[in-house]
Structures are given as C-alpha cells and as structure tokens.
C-alpha cells in the first residue's frame, strides 16, 4: 500500500509559539515527528510550513519541504498547496500528521492509512481512551464521540459526553481523546478546500468539524496506545519527564 505523509508545521501557534522547533530529548519536535513518519512505510514524507527557519531545518535533514505562500485557517487547507505543487494524483492516499504528535508511533501512522483503504472510507482518524478526569475537562484535549459503527458523531473541546459519574472505570470506558492524524485521498483534500468554514469549526477551532458540517463521515479507530500525547501548550512539556 502506497501513501504519502504530509506534516503541516505552523510556526506562530497562539498557544505555543515556535512549537515545531522546541527541543525534545536533544532534537527539535518536528524531527521526531518526521522520523516516525519515515518509519511508517510512507513512500514520501513532505513538510509544509510558513517559516524559513523550519524550512531550512527540514531541508537540511533531506526531507521534501514546501514553504507555503498563503495564510491558512488549518493544516488541511495548507495541504492543498503541497498537493498541487507536487502534482499529487486524486487517488493517492494522504496522511495528514500533525507536527505536535511526536510520540505517535509508525505502526499507528500506517494503520490509519490502511483503514482508509480497507474500509473504503472518506476520512480515517485515530482516538485513544481518556484515563483521568483532568483530561476530560482540559480544553486543549479534543474529545470525540462515535456511533456503533465507529464513525464520529462530534468532536469538541468541551466535555462530551456529559455525565454525572466520573469514577476511573467509567472514564476509561466512555471518553475518547482525538489524536491529530487523518488519512484521506488527495481528491477529498481538494474537495475540502472548496468548502467554506463552518460556524462550529470556528467556535471550537477544530478543522475536522467542517467535514461533519458538510455531511461527510470520519471513521475513528480506537487504539490503546501508551505514552501517546500531543504537545499543545508549554505545560505539556512536563509530560515528557515521565515518558
């Protein structure tokens, strides 16, 4: 199975400026993410960025990189410029891997692409069980609820689903944390770029809600992955000490 991993790397994040370049165990975060992508079996790994410093670092490490010319509302919108620049065909599987997922292992990256093809999906993504009450109420952790067939009903920074009981057993079996990775065909990315932003997307600041808004379905694979956490804010760096 052939797939391309594209990593959007925005420099000026409101919650964590210069995030792609932060040092994690002696290497910039973006290099960790790239290395995992390379190990996944991807035929190509491409970085798209709005910053010259990131561009130079990635280029120095021998990875394809595109310096984007425009401001975008989301990483998915940024992908379209890479797809057009590199003349990627409509039937090519694209894995959109968020730069702030440096601990997502190569097998999980591969499996998101594999699910897309095997199940003939429009969009494939990943979630892991939430294990503690603190994560449920953390707005930087995106929650997802799914239907009986594994398709997303909604993504939110708020507590979903709401309940009265937050004991550890109930939390572990009822709450899911979304992981920043998507697989889809290049044709769908082109379609997505033609959709206007939805009001829910703007309210929650979650690009995947645009997909649901326009009636498309997102399949969510639920995996029990240890030590899988994203770097959203400076405080998340504290998790690395226990990693």
Curated annotation (Swiss-Prot):
UniProt key word tRNA processing: no
Enzyme type, top EC level: transferase
Catalytic reaction list: 3-deoxy-alpha-D-manno-oct-2-ulosonate + CTP = CMP-3-deoxy-beta-D-manno-octulosonate + diphosphate
Pathway note: Nucleotide-sugar biosynthesis; CMP-3-deoxy-D-manno-octulosonate biosynthesis; CMP-3-deoxy-D-manno-octulosonate from 3-deoxy-D-manno-octulosonate and CTP: step 1/1
The keyword Transferase belongs to this UniProt entry's keyword annotation: yes
Keywords from the UniProt entry: Cytoplasm, Lipopolysaccharide biosynthesis, Nucleotidyltransferase, Transferase
Source species, domain of life: Bacteria
Cellular location(s): Cytoplasm
EC number: 2.7.7.38
GO-annotated cellular components: cytosol
GO MF term list: 3-deoxy-manno-octulosonate cytidylyltransferase activity
BP terms from Gene Ontology: CMP-keto-3-deoxy-D-manno-octulosonic acid biosynthetic process; lipopolysaccharide biosynthetic process
Signal peptide: none
Pfam families in alphabetical order: CTP_transf_3
Job of this protein: Activates KDO (a required 8-carbon sugar) for incorporation into bacterial lipopolysaccharide in Gram-negative bacteria.
Family that this chain belongs to: Belongs to the KdsB family.
NCBIfam families cross-referenced by the UniProt entry: kdsB (TIGR00466), PRK05450.1-5 (NF003952)
Protein name: 3-deoxy-manno-octulosonate cytidylyltransferase
């Amino acid at each position: 199975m052939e797939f391309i991993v594209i990593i959007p790397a925005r420099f000026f994040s409101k919650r964590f400026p210069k995030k792609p370049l932060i040092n994690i165990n002696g290497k910039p975060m973006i290099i960790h993410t790239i290395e995992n992508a390379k190990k996944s079996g991807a035929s190509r790994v491409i970085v798209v960025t709005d910053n010259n410093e990131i561009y130079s670092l990635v280029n120095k490490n021998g990875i394809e990189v595109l310096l984007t010319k425009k401001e975008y509302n989301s990483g998915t919108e940024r992908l379209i410029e890479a797809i057009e620049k590199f003349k990627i065909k409509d039937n090519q599987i694209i894995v959109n891997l968020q730069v702030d997922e440096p601990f997502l292992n190569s097998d999980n990256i591969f499996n998101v692409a594999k699910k897309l093809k095997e199940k003939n999906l429009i969009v494939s993504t990943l979630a892991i069980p939430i294990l503690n009450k603190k994560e449920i109420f953390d707005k930087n952790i995106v929650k997802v609820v799914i239907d009986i067939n594994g398709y997303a009903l909604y993504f939110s920074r708020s507590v979903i689903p709401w309940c009265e009981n937050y004991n550890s057993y109930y939390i572990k079996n009822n709450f899911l944390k979304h992981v920043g990775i998507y697989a889809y065909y290049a044709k769908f990315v082109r379609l997505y770029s033609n959709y206007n932003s939805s009001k829910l997307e703007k309210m929650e600041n979650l690009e995947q809600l645009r997909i649901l808004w326009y009636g498309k379905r997102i399949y969510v694979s639920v995996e029990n992955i240890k030590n899988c956490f994203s770097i959203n804010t400076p405080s998340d760096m504290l998790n690395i000490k226990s990693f």
